[in-house]
Amino acid sequence: MKVAENQKVYDITIIGGGPTGLFTAFYGGMRQASVKIIESLPQLGGQLSALYPEKYIYDVAGFPKVRAQELVDNLKEQMKKFDPTVCLEEAVDTLEKQADGIFKLVTNKQTHYSKSVIITAGNGAFQPRRLELEGTAKYEKKNLHYFVDDMNKFAGKRVVVFGGGDSAVDWTMMLEPIAEKVTIVHRRDKFRAHEHSVENLMNSRAEVSTPYVPVELIGDDKIEQVVLQHVKTEEKVIIDVDDVIVNYGFVSSLGPIKNWGLDIQKNSILVNSKMETNIPGIYAAGDICTYEGKVKLIACGFGEAPTAVNNAKAYFDPNAKLQPMHSSSMF
């Protein structure tokens, strides 16, 4: 095998640590496979954790409603029983099948080897649209935020939210009861969020600054003030702040996945009823994959994960049973 010395070859490597990826990792453990998750974001949970951790989800079986982050936390707790290896802030650049049948995955940090691969990358890698002002980079990971993982850290703070879509309005409304002051800044007079959400915003104690755009951030180690400029009159105002949240949306892309030799249809990976791609040993599940009649829901991804794992197990271990025992008889 062309494997680096002391480099472990995993049974299953999962690309993408969203809800489908987390359940795939758990189920891989159920099949006694060694499992690794590679995730490009700083945390597990995919869009649930990055975009709307405090929102409720209503279409997951067995939950009348469940907060997005709570669902992620439950999935992490579930898979922890089998202790999968987790690699965060790693994006897979190349994926190739070697002559010996082992898959080689090269990321921005290191090289991984695996007997099979399951891609659960959602809509692909996504990154926030960043605030394009001079010097913004030095404030990131301090008090300039593109991801919000814990609302409580904004308690009693003066918070400014940039954006006019659903996420910006939702975050403003969730911060309104706990922040000392929350201001939402949008470059247009009208918001793009749902009408009911906008109505709630207008009836809240949140301050609304429209049509304004940020033109300068002031502060040494952290942002202390934000300079806003009126879009029409060019009048400038200065706001004192403790934290700034940017909600300009996210840019998602399959990126390097398009170069891995997989059959791609409309930015999705084509799979068969085994969740198998056109490359034997590579499978896909969740929103990243497509087939006739495909429905893109978290609940569907949870169903596709065991199919992918069971077929991956049969691929790298032909003596393994495709149909596993029921979990109730295993614990």
From Swiss-Prot:
It is an enzyme of class 1 (oxidoreductase). Its cofactor is FAD. InterPro entries: FAD/NAD-bd_sf, FAD/NAD-binding_dom, Fd--NADP_Rdtase_type_2, Ferredoxin-NADP_redctase_2. One of its GO terms (molecular function) is thioredoxin-disulfide reductase (NADPH) activity. Binds 1 FAD per subunit. Its EC number is 1.18.1.2. GO terms for biological process: cell redox homeostasis. Keywords: FAD, Flavoprotein, NADP, Oxidoreductase. It catalyses: 2 reduced [2Fe-2S]-[ferredoxin] + NADP(+) + H(+) = 2 oxidized [2Fe-2S]-[ferredoxin] + NADPH. It holds the Pfam family Pyr_redox_2. FAD binds at residues 20, 39, 47, 52, 92, 126, 287, 328. Belongs to the ferredoxin--NADP reductase type 2 family. Homodimer. This is Ferredoxin--NADP reductase. It comes from Bacillus cereus (strain ATCC 14579 / DSM 31 / CCUG 7414 / JCM 2152 / NBRC 15305 / NCIMB 9373 / NCTC 2599 / NRRL B-3711).
